[in-house]
Each structure stands twice: as C-alpha cells, then as structure tokens.
Amino acid sequence: FACLIWNPVLVAVAIAIIATQQHALIVLCHDSTHYRLFNPRWLNDLVGRTCGMVVGVSMCTYRIVHRLHHNHLYQDQDPDIPLHGGYPRGRMYLAKKLFRDFCGLSAWKTYAYFFGAPSTNTESSVQSSPPLDDTSKRLQYSAREDRWLVAGFHVTALFLAFAAGYGLQYLLLWVLPLATVVPALLRLRALCEHGAVNDITSPLRAARTNFSPRWLQWILFPHNVNYHLEHHVYPAIPHYKLPDCHREMVKLDAFEKAEIRTVQETFGL
C-alpha cells in the first residue's frame, strides 16, 4: 500500500515495520542454531535455514559463530564483542554508532558476521582467528553450502523482482530495512543483553534479562529473546519456555544480584 501511493511517511513506517519482522526471523534463526525450534533436526534446520536465508543470514554458519559467543563470553574469541564490548562509552558514542547503522554503513559488517568473517575486538585490537575453523568438517561443509544458498537466493530474488517490474519495491521494502534498521536493532539488543554488565565472570551477571513495555518487546525483543540471562544459563531451553524458566528461577530465589533490569535501567534513563 505504501508503494502504491508513494507516501514518504507510509514508506518509512513500512520500512520500520518490515525491519522488526526481519529481526524476528533472525531471532528464530538463532533458536535453530541451538536445535531448539523443532525436535526433528531436519525440520529444525529446514525452518532455521529458511528464516535465515530470506534475511541474508547463513544459519549453519551462524551456528558455528554463535557457539563461540556462548563458550567464550567476553573473551577475545567472542565474536559479539564489537557490538557490546567496552560500554559504558557515553550516549554520543552510541548515537554515532546508530547513525552509521541507519545510514547502512555497518551493514557489510553485520552480514559478514553472519557469514563467518573474523571479528576484531576494538578494545584490544585483537582479531579473532577464523571462527569457521573451530568446528567439525561436517559443520564446515554445511556452513559453506548454506552460504552459497543464501547468496544465490538473494541474487535470484533481485533478478526476479526486476524482471517482474518490482525491483524498486524489493530494494526499498526488503533490502533497505535489512541494510539500515536491522543492524541498529541488533546493536541495541546486544547492548541490552551484554553491555556494561556488572561481572563478566559470573553466569548470572554476564548476561542480562530486560523487561520492557509490550510495544518495545515487539520491536526489540521478539520471541522472548529478552530472557537472555536464562538463555545463557540454560541454552537448551527453547524460546517459548524461557518465561517459564524465569518464573521457576524466581521461585528458587536463583536471581540474587543477577542482571535483571528494565530497558530504562539498562540505558540509564
């Protein structure tokens, strides 16, 4: 509808809404890296790879990269440190980073990450070793195959969109949100999950669970991804069981001094 009348405000709203749903697909792809979308692994991987493919993410590659984040949290091998490391850095620093995200200047880094490119810890200037080397030959093969499928899908989609006369709409309403809004959402969520935590050596204080109004939950924390502390303690629990996990841990008084905050507290608002 936004493209039919080409109203700039409606187009901007459409881009923002589509980006939130693209982000939600990445969250489902994340769950599949843990083999937690469906019990049959073939179905888990089929759905996870499909969710990732349409948003430029190689799920099989992300599976390898994301394991390093769990196994080496806050260490030089953690591929997520460029997003969440070194905070607090001040609001102006974050504003500059988000400006770059919204301008599409960090898109190549975002999707290079999902394709297994080594990351650099900006705090220590240490470049991690190639993350895809740290796994089995079978997973390496699956990741390589998946990357070709993702790349092929997007080349084909672009060709078909232009052939059908919808090339501009495809670029504006699918590629542009992926290149601008999605990297910003990923950065903000990473900061909520791990930015400026109290104790990187404690399982209950190195990751953070964030509570927010329902509208913000829909934008920034789809599929219960706000329960990040619980996810790091129990990564085998699927996303739809994380609220139950939180309630059980509350009953057991397991959250003493744990990183559980509102989003306003996380950002010091």
How should these model regions be labeled?
Residues 6-9, 32-40, 118, 191-199:
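Membrane-interface elements of multi-pass transporters and channels
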Residues 197-201, 233-234, 244, 250-252:
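Polar-ligand-bearing catalytic/cofactor-coordination segments
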Residues 25-34, 62-74, 189-196, 221-237:
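Histidine-centered catalytic micro-motifs
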Residues 123, 127-138, 204-227:
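Active-site-proximal inter-transmembrane loops
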Residues 19-29, 58, 98, 106-110, ...:
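Transmembrane alpha-helical segments that form the membrane-embedded catalytic/substrate-channel core
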